[in-house]
Amino acid sequence: MPTLDWLNRAHAFTVSARVPYRLLEQVSVHARTPGGHTTPPAIPAAPAQAELVKEPAAAPTLPSKPTHDNLLIQGDNLEALKALLPFYRGQVKCIFIDPPYNTKSAFEHYDDNLEHAQWLSMMLPRLQLLRELLREDGSIWVTIDDNEGHYLKVLMDEVFGRGNFVANVVWQKAYGPRSNAFLLSDSHDHMLIYGKSKPTLRFGLLSRSDEQTAKYKNPD
C-alpha cells in the first residue's frame, strides 16, 4: 500500500506513545448564586496545571469510570486524548473531528498555516490515539478541504487500514460563486469516514416518511 513520506515522519510515529499521561483535574461546572440560580463559572486565564505521571509508559491509577458522562476538557488536544485512554480505550462508538484545514486562515486558538510536513506530523499522533479510543464497530468522521484532503486520505489509510475506508462524503459549503476567487470558486468540502473494523460497522437507518413511501407504487 502506498504511504506518505515527509520530514520527521519517523519522529511523528512515536509521538503518541511518548505523550505523558496527565490526570484530569475536575472543576465545578456551575456556580450557584444567592438567588438559587446556576451560572457558568468564569473562564480561567490559563488551563489548570495537571499532575504529571512519572512513568508515561504506564497508565496512571484512575477510577474505572468517570464521575460524569459528559466531559469538557481544556488543554492541548493531544494530551487530552492520551488522558482519555484509561477511561475510554476501545469504547467510543463515533468520533467527529474538524481539524485545522491548513489554509492560511486566521484562527485564534491554533495555527492554521502550517507547512505540509508539520501538518501531517500534527495529525498523525492524534489519529493514532483516536483509533485506540474507537470500539471495533466504531467509526471516525473527519471534515477537511481540498488543501490537505488527499494527503489526509492516504494518511488515514495507513492509520486505520485502507480496507476500513467507508466513504468520502462531499458536502456543499457555498451556494454561489465567490467574487474574490482567483481561478475557480470551490463550493464543497469533504468528510472522510473510516471504521475501526469495517465488517462490524453498522449505521442506523432512518425510517421512511409517509411522503417518501407514497412515491413507490409496488409494495415490498
Which role fits each region the language model picked out?
Residues 116-170:
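Conserved Class I SAM-dependent methyltransferase catalytic core
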Residues 1-96, 103-117, 122-125:
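DnaQ-like (DEDDh/DEDDy) 3′-5′ exonuclease domain used for proofreading
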Residues 176-220:
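Flexible, glycine-/basic-rich loop-and-beta segments that form/coincide
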Residues 72, 96, 141-143, 170, ...:
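Structured core elements
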Residues 101-102, 146-149, 174-176, 197-200:
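Conserved nucleotide-binding/hydrolysis micro-motifs of P-loop NTPases
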Residues 86-89, 154-162, 185-186:
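Short, surface-exposed basic-aromatic patches at helix termini and helix-loop junctions that form
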Residues 84, 105-110, 152-154, 168, ...:
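Short, solvent-exposed loop/turn and secondary-structure capping segments
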